[in-house]
Amino acid sequence: MARPQPCGPPHARCGSPSLPERPLQVKVVGLFSCPNFQIAKSAAENLKNNHPSKFEDPILVPLQEFAWHQYLQEKKRELKNETWEYSSSVISFVNGQFLGDALDLQKWAHEVWDIVDIKPSALYDALTEDFSAKFLRDTKHDFVFLDICIDSSPIGRLIFELYCDVCPKTCKNFQVLCTGKAGFSQRGIRLHYKNSIFHRIVQNGWIQGGDIVYGKGDNGESIYGPTFEDENFSVPHNKRGVLGMANKGRHSNGSQFYITLQATPYLDRKFVAFGQLIEGTEVLKQLELVPTQNERPIHMCRITDSGDPYA
């Protein structure tokens, strides 16, 4: 997509006859698991390496899928018509001015700064795979998934990042309930989210599930016994997709959990948040739109499988 472009060196065609006094800085924000992010990253780094006096170090912001969609929606509201139909997995700026996607940045680097990218697409695929593995490993966090269906129709997968460095006990409970490795509790409850349901949807609030006993929303079981204590309240409920433990009062966590649909600061210091949705933007939207009666979904919203997505 052609966009008004920042000025280049004096010999380049540009709306201004001279180079800006301050160096240019390229910013790339995008979906870390997409090759286009690596293409844009390479273009930004090549600009700096080939013209070190003209460019500052680029700002590179890799994002998980859910965070990317949230970021893009915010940018669309901020930039309005300029990006309203924008659908790429990466976005680039030069000195804060919107430039475009990875190909727009690559084109600008070529036409204005004489930089040609000859890397094959297979190399970018390999770079993406290596970068993704390192990106996830460097978080030092655990990850789990829930596969969801509405009635008998599969709608996709939710993937969560668990803040096991902040809430290790709470995260272990959720992780083991996802994998089912604990087997059965002393009272014979199967400690596994598989085949459990989402029993509550609070509009503009949260969706709730995890009653692995009867699915009615009045029971549950942790891997430590019927309940366990509130570990801490370090993670705020400051955005959509926050994962937390539902309870019946202080120190009564079991297996029930919730996923916020927007910032819910009124839950802070009352419920333990311990993770964040990182993939499954459209899945959460579909769950959010299920009609309810007294906050109970009128269609069966079931977890068909759960576990470690990268095992």
UniProtKB/Swiss-Prot annotation:
Stored Pfam families: Pro_isomerase
Entry GO CC: cytoplasm
Lineage: superkingdom: Eukaryota
Domain PPIase cyclophilin-type: 145-308
Coiled coil: none
Matching SUPFAM superfamilies: Cyclophilin-like (SSF50891)
InterPro entries reported in the protein's UniProt record: Cyclophilin-like_dom_sf (IPR029000), Cyclophilin-type_PPIase_dom (IPR002130)
Gene3D superfamilies: Cyclophilin-like
Function: Probable inactive PPIase with no peptidyl-prolyl cis-trans isomerase activity.
Assigned protein family: Belongs to the cyclophilin-type PPIase family.
Protein name listed in UniProt: Probable inactive peptidyl-prolyl cis-trans isomerase-like 6
Gene name of this polypeptide: PPIL6
